Amino acid sequence: MENIAHIFCNPEEEYWTIPPIKSFLKENDVKVDNVSAIKENTKTKLIDAAMDFAEQNEENKQIFIEWIDRTVKEGIKEIILHKCQMDEGMNLTFANEASTRKFLDMYVDTESTGYLINSKYDNKTRMVKYTLSKIRDKRAITLYFGKMITYIDKRKSKCRDIEFPVIFEYFIDEGWYLVRYKARSNLYEYHPEFQNEYMKTDYPVQDSKLVQEAVQQAMHILQLKEITGSEQSYFLKKMFYRILKQFTETPPEIKDRLDQYKNNIISMEQNIKELCRISEGQTFSLHSDLCNLFEKYISINWLDKEIFTRHRKAYPIKLRATDEEDSHVDQTAGGDSGPLQSKAIFFDNKRMIDNDEMCDGLTLKWKRSVRTYYPETFTVRISEKRGKCYLSFKEYTAEEDIQDVLFSIIGA
């Protein structure tokens, strides 16, 4: 198959991991015998089997290249989520599918195959394709951009030219855009006229610059304007706090135990007020502190830690926050030792976070909807920078699971 074995099929590029390849082979009844116990050999063998399937006939080829575009969109990804406004004049253009397609067709590269694979790439960022869809009943326009760059593997002293895809998605009615890409380093501008690899090192480029080039094109095409300013940062940190509260609600078992100690808390509160001569204005703070203290020690000594995860689709393992006095909190559960809510450090700073109702960022263990060949959970890091929401998926994550995270944020 022409040019089929390029970046998206290269085992070294990590666009695929073993689980999605196995899923593809299973869906298409492809059996692979004598799979090695060595991970690298297994992956190569599975990719070869997928490509053999694609080369059997045109129908298989079409199934394969459509699957590639889907898997490049999901997986190990960095995602930027940002609020934006569309020019009012574009409402009529995007009112129906026919007018939308007529408009977007003007911007698709003339040498594109209509897919990421086998399209022509050079040192210019080009729109390779677009799709119109409804994602969870929300209208979306997805633009696929690509550019050729040079990657230098400094450990092996080798360089190779690779495609750098950037996927831009705009939710028309919600006013959000998101950008997906695979984080990379050791990248250089593509100069095919240079035969000597040392000459190529004179033109380094950051992946963020490549992403920005695609975003600027997309914003121009769709006539979007970013919503900027400190209020956007404030808005996101409030959203993160609501997500944190959603996934750290006090479990019913612990609420029941706190109710049992209600009289003890009231008695201690009265004693402290008398001993320390606390004013009425500080009474509420004292009561909250005592409730937090009781909940802390009940939680960290509760034997069944699954009460903090059992009926939740996600739970935090790390969070960051800063209060109005610039006191900084950086909490972690310590590796994969359990949910942050079962740790003393969570309660040590809970009052500060609840007072401001803001969170700078958090890392969550998220339960997968798609579990065949995958572990039960994946990790996602959520943060804010200059009014934009950044999500980092460091392990292969299926599209359905990525959407779970995205719409939990958008809907917060």
Regions found by a protein language model. Give the residues of each.
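Intrinsically disordered, low-complexity, charge-rich terminal extensions
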Residues: 1-412
